[in-house]
């Protein structure tokens, strides 16, 4: 993991840099956000995300990244509108998979981060005690109430830059406003 190498080099004074937390590769499910595996490419480790199938697979992946020395584990609970078949309103992981990730991360005193745009994925993150939620884009009154009840322990990162770019600068790449708004 390059993140770990860079963080260690900064901390050891080998290169100048800010305080830096090394993150895992994104953990996803087959067909979810970050799954870029293709049947003709035999190297799944080159995919943007690591695929898991079930709680034990999740546990294995999380342990592997923690062994490598990451500071945080990122899991993708929902999709995104620019991902065919995995739009923003989805919630991909089972509660057992999320619980396994949270248990392993908390046991080792690390952070867990989630990509959660759909209300179901935001609620799932909150139910499992996840403190750092990226996006939280599509919500409702119930979800907002849950977030407010947890306001002293959660941090929401809306990721405004990507939303702006999707709406205003992505058409040349085939992402129309209709696709971007879901």
Locate the predicted segments by residue.
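Alpha-helical scaffold segments that flank or form the walls of functional sites
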Residues: 1-16, 49-74, 103
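Long, contiguous hydrophobic alpha-helical segments, chiefly transmembrane helices and signal peptides
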Residues: 20, 26, 58, 76-77, ...
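Active-site mouth loops of central-metabolism enzymes
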Residues: 37-61, 107, 111-113, 181
């Amino acid at each position: 993991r390059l993140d770990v190498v860079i963080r260690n080099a900064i901390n050891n004074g080998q290169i100048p840099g800010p305080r830096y937390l090394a993150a895992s590769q994104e953990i996803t499910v087959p067909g979810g956000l970050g799954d870029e595996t293709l049947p003709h490419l035999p190297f799944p480790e080159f995919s943007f995300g690591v695929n898991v199938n079930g709680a034990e697979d999740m546990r294995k992946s999380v342990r592997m990244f923690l062994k490598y020395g990451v500071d945080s584990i990122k899991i993708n609970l929902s999709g995104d509108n620019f991902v065919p078949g995995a739009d923003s309103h989805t919630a991909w992981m089972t509660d057992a998979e999320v619980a396994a990730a949270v248990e392993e991360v908390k046991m080792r005193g690390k952070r867990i981060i989630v990509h959660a745009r759909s209300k179901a994925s935001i609620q799932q993150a909150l139910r499992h005690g996840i403190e750092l939620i990226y996006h939280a884009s599509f919500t409702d009154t119930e979800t907002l109430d849950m977030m407010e009840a947890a306001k002293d322990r959660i941090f929401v990162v809306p990721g405004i830059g990507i939303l702006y770019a999707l709406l205003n600068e992505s058409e040349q790449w085939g992402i129309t406003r209709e696709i971007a708004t879901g």
